[in-house]
Amino acid sequence: MAQEKKKRIVTWDDPMPGAAAAREMGGLPFLRAILAGEQPPPPIGELMGFEPLEVEEGRALFVCTPAEYHYNPIGAVHGGLACTLLDSAMGCAVHTMLPAGVGYTTVELKVSFLRPITLKTGRLLCEGTIIYLGSRIATAEARLLDTSGKLYGHATTTCMILRNLAPEQPKPSVGE
């Protein structure tokens, strides 16, 4: 007898107005606006089931509670969840330091997975902190812990700083 399939419905806001606001605001005010509900959260958080908890200059803290839909074929949470949490926390730590009109993108990511994450792990906290901020490159690190402080993974990143971000323009249709 086949088991009934489980389902999960994911909803999100159009990300383009938020992306435009991110270009117009400094990184820290923009991230604080997300926390205050004044800007919508990015779709990746809605999809993966995590959210920012705190932001301050050079630091970002995310929270996630692993669920069945995070599982891989061998009965543990897929490493992609931890990797995405770590990348998000580090990227946002960098973003807190950037003025309006300046963005970033991850160019290198090194992740160390230390132990399996399961439903029994419970709530996870992921804290990213900036290590270095230059005019073209930033580096950051992050740690993924449970609520008792047990370390599940850590990472470092190198981000490219993107200056003079222009608002995204619609692409013309063929024949225009």
Model-predicted regions and their roles:
Residues 1-176:
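Terminal targeting signals and extreme-terminal segments of soluble enzymes
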